[in-house]
């Protein structure tokens, strides 16, 4: 049976280890990111799997309406969905953002913990997901879980 580790833990490990600048570490954040379209972003290029078998709140129907299960590559982290150029989003992603604003929590897409931009295998354009839900429906495959655990275990003990 394949074991997965939450992508949120993986990203946390990368931030903690300094591979990705953290929000509260302004100096490394500026060094590790570029400024584009009014928002910070970085290339993560992390393979992941979208899986709806877990319980993750009241917004399940919105995710299922616009997204599908399958392998994806997480390409960038943005502060909010307004920073993502519309030309790189699928029609479903644009509809998802509109539906989320009208029927869910607008704050999570536009000012919350940030959003992940990802693409399904073989697709030219991508989708967006609030970070608040990324850890519950997106998982890192085993081969990347080992890298995440190495980063976590290499941290200084305080």
Curated annotation (Swiss-Prot):
Q: What is the lineage of its organism?
A: Viruses, Duplodnaviria, Heunggongvirae, Uroviricota, Caudoviricetes
Q: What is this protein called?
A: Putative gene 52 protein
Q: Which gene encodes it?
A: 52
Q: Which organism is it from?
A: Bacillus phage SP01 (Bacteriophage SP01)
């Amino acid at each position: 049976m394949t074991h997965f580790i939450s992508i949120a833990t993986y990203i946390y490990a990368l931030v903690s280890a300094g591979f990705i600048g953290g929000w509260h570490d302004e100096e490394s954040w500026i060094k590790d990111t570029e400024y584009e379209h009014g928002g910070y972003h970085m290339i993560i290029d992390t393979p992941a799997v979208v899986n709806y078998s877990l319980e993750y709140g009241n917004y399940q129907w919105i995710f299922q309406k616009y997204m599908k299960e399958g392998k994806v590559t997480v390409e960038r982290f943005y502060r909010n969905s307004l920073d993502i150029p519309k030309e790189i989003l699928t029609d479903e992603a644009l509809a998802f953002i509109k539906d989320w604003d009208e029927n869910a929590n607008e704050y999570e897409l536009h000012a919350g913990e940030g959003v992940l931009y990802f693409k399904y295998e073989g697709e030219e354009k991508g989708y967006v997901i609030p970070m608040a839900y990324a850890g519950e429906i997106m998982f890192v495959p085993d081969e990347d879980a080992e890298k995440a655990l190495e980063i976590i275990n290499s941290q200084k003990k305080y």
